[in-house]
Amino acid sequence: AMDPQQRLLLTYAWKAIEDAGYASKSLSGTKTGVFIGTGNTGYGSLLANADAEIEGSSAANTSPSVGPNRVSYTLNLHGPSEPIDTACSSSLVAIHHAVSSIEEGTCDMALAGGINTIVLPDVYISFDKAGALSKEGRCKTFSDQADGFAHGEGAGLFFLKKPKAAEADGGHIYGVIKGSAVNHGGRAASLTTPNPKQQAEVIKAAYKKAGIDPKTVSYIEAHGTGT
């Protein structure tokens, strides 16, 4: 049986392409990349616990790395096909990689985003024992009332290409990514604790690349726990 995450990924890839105004068949053979924030869902363990028969396709059907590759295979896309797992920031890092690949010419277009499904309680139990989950089941990002985060499921993909190319095609354009940046906090208070100084640095780097004065920004969204 195929991991539900892979099935959903195929569905949302198709939706993203159509929403952008393209026919999936028109992308066949093109330098279109696939960059997906993904991770282990535990579906393989679920099958093992149910004593499901191991088939020749079992390894591929339950591997997170196969998700984006299955999209590339199904749609015959010839650009890079990469799974990205950086925990809470996986989707944003996937989009960063997609943008960089388009800018350097590795691909002309890209499907980028992330997906997360939870089929076993193991992760919840671990996070709860670590004191990371909100008792109210709500994220209170940037609030002094924050008491943890809510671990959830979801999927979201963008279809990306250079602005001039998108305008020439007459596709549905939601917005323009002016710039992006990525780094790591290095040594912090603990393995999972953010490093505020390095977070500030990566934000500055993104502003600089985009050529945007921070004073002109009036709306900000933050990923995951807001870290």
What are these model-derived regions, one by one?
Residues 1-227:
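Condensing-enzyme catalytic core of the thiolase-fold
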